[in-house]
């Protein structure tokens, strides 16, 4: 703090730049991370990047029944939802601490930020 209770702008700028670098690193880690979700006890598995992009889908031939396509569709959706949920957990773990710098406490010395 400078005299008069004003924040030191160079210190705030350095802190903001550090947070930006941490955010970029966390986003890169998320983009490279892959998680796998499953349904039907592993009969259908889906692989999703941390960004939410589906990059893989494996279906055990045992669940392919031409007379019961709906079950297979449900299993595929379930596996993708499971993987997406795991990707969101990774995002919360990686970005949560960084977002905490803006929410609630905000930037030190700057109310509302």
UniProtKB/Swiss-Prot annotation:
The keyword DNA-binding applies. It is found in: Cytoplasm, Nucleoid. Signal peptide: none annotated. InterPro entries: YbaB-like_sf (IPR036894), YbaB/EbfC (IPR004401). GO terms for molecular function: DNA binding. GO terms for cellular component: bacterial nucleoid; cytosol. It holds the Pfam family YbaB_DNA_bd. Disulfide bonds: none annotated. It comes from the Bacteria. Keywords: Cytoplasm, DNA-binding. Transmembrane segments: none annotated. Binds to DNA and alters its conformation. May be involved in regulation of gene expression, nucleoid organization and DNA protection. Belongs to the YbaB/EbfC family. PANTHER family: NUCLEOID-ASSOCIATED PROTEIN YBAB (PTHR33449:SF1). This is Nucleoid-associated protein ROP_41370. It comes from Rhodococcus opacus (strain B4).
């Amino acid at each position: 703090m400078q005299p008069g209770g004003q924040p030191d702008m160079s210190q705030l700028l350095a802190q903001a730049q550090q947070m930006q670098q941490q955010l970029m690193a966390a986003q890169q880690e998320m983009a490279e991370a892959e998680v796998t979700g499953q349904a039907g006890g592993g009969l259908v598995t889906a692989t999703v990047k941390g960004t939410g992009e589906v990059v893989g889908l494996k279906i055990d031939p045992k669940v392919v029944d031409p007379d019961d396509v709906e079950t297979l569709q449900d299993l595929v959706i379930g596996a993708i939802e499971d993987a997406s949920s795991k990707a969101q957990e990774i995002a919360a773990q990686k970005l949560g601490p960084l977002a905490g710098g803006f929410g609630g406490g905000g930037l030190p010395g700057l109310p509302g930020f």
